[in-house]
Amino acid sequence: MAGHTENEITIAAPVDLVWDMTNDLERWPELFSEYASCEVLSREANTVTFRLTMHPDENGKVWSWVSERTADREKLVVRARRVETGPFEYMNIVWEYEETPDGTRMHWTQDFAMKPDAPVDDAGMTDIINRNSPIQMALIRDRIEEVSCTTP
């Protein structure tokens, strides 16, 4: 059985600002509380390959992996996948943006499967993602809205 999650939030800011800030990977440690660093390894057309490193977990373990994101600005969609899968058989993420009367709706869809020897199974990771995504999305919303309020 594979895992699947969907989470979304509305950000009271123009879609251009939301798009630009959430696709500025070098600034992800400022947007997300869980990332200690984001190192861009390569850029080719609309595809970026990068290494994410998390802050140490409760056991002191630091998780790090390489991912790839391909952005389609015209369709307001970003497709990402883990290149170094770690405990996942695969992990695919779709970020979708939609302009709304209240600002910008940002929607994340994550499809994945855990390896048999992973510390959690698909259901466990689904729970973790569904607990953490709203927290991270709220931080992103707050940080973008703060910039939006100060940008003429």
UniProtKB/Swiss-Prot annotation:
Alphabetical keyword list: Antibiotic biosynthesis
Source superkingdom: Bacteria
InterPro entries in UniProt: COQ10_START (IPR005031), START-like_dom_sf (IPR023393)
Disulfide bridge positions per record: none
Pathway(s) served: Antibiotic biosynthesis; curamycin biosynthesis
A matching Pfam family: Polyketide_cyc
UniProt record, GO biological process: antibiotic biosynthetic process
Annotated CDD domains: TcmN_ARO-CYC_like (cd08860)
SUPFAM superfamilies the record matches: Bet v1-like
Sequence similarity: To polyketide cyclases.
Protein name: Putative polyketide cyclase
